[in-house]
Amino acid sequence: MEHTNVKILAISDVPSKALWDYDTRARLEGIDLILSCGDLPKKYLEYLTNFTAAPILYVHGNHDGSYQTEGEPGGCICVDDQVYTWKGLRIMGLGGCQRYNKEDTYQYTEKAMRRRAHKLEHQAHKKGGIDLLLTHAPAAGLNDGTDRAHKGFACFNDLMDEYEPGWFVHGHVHLCYDAKLPRVCSRGNTTVINATERYVFEIPDRQQDMTQQRRCFWQKWLAI
């Protein structure tokens, strides 16, 4: 059986002028799934839904407090605090960033974020693991910032160690902050992507491979 790829558009933090202003439909052609890592205007996400049949899955950023008064983006799917499955792809969503003040919503201490991740263990185990970790903030020590607001979460590293997802997609740390920040790197078997503004990548659409991943996950846990 011939294997095909799924084309994913990851977006975060900064609305892309290329998508916002000009020939949006053509630029979204061929995109199968859109993942938003947060801090994007509600109207921007809703605008994109008008030009693509691809579902838009999102987590909250620390500047998305307006969603609580204006409502969540219409036509999009919030995957915060759940393990959401799209065509066999198991996505764990954990939005927000490190707490750095008392004003903005979607800010968490390390302890609070770890508690959120722990609450998703049952969902993840029931589904035989996760394939993609979708967050707003980066992982601690993995291309995160040195200031309090942009420090990463250590528990994200633990999630990568435990579940070994194929991909970890985050935002929050703008690439313009440091010219040395990589767009893509890796940690173990996980490809780590900084989705600031926009980034397109492909993953295998292989139900057979996902079945094998689930089998390996359960073999790992049964051996403990």
Task: Report the location of each language-model feature.
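A short, gly/pro- and small-residue-rich
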Residues: 52-63, 153-156
